[in-house]
Amino acid sequence: MKKRFTEQQIIGFLKEAEAGMPVKELCRKHGFSDASFYTWRAKFGGMEVSEARRLKDLEVENARLKKLLAEAMLDMEALKVVVKGKP
C-alpha cells in the first residue's frame, strides 16, 4: 500500500490533535482512519519532523543490516557444508 502522507504531514496532524481538535473530526477532515491516527501517535508521538526522519532512516538501515546478516549466515552455513564434505 502506498503511503499517502509524509512524516511532516503526520506530525502536523498529531499537533492538531494535541491542540485540542477531536480525533474523529481530524480524521474526517484529512481523510484517514482513527486507527491510522492512533498508530501514528504510537510511532511519532512527541517527535519533531527531523526526529521522525531520523527514525525512518534508522529503520531503513536496520532492515538493510538484518538482510546483510542473514546473507552472511547463509554463506557461513554453505561453507560449513563444503568443508565437511572434503576428505
Swiss-Prot record:
Keywords: Transposable element
Keyword Iron on entry: no
InterPro entries: Homeodomain-like_sf (IPR009057), Transposase_8 (IPR002514), Transposase_8_domain (IPR052546)
Record GO terms (molecular function): DNA binding; transposase activity
Species of the source: Burkholderia multivorans (strain ATCC 17616 / 249)
Name listed for the protein in its UniProt record: Insertion element IS407 uncharacterized 10.0 kDa protein
Domain of life where this protein originates: Bacteria
Gene Ontology biological process terms in this record: DNA transposition
Transmembrane is among the record's keywords: no
Family: Belongs to the transposase 8 family.
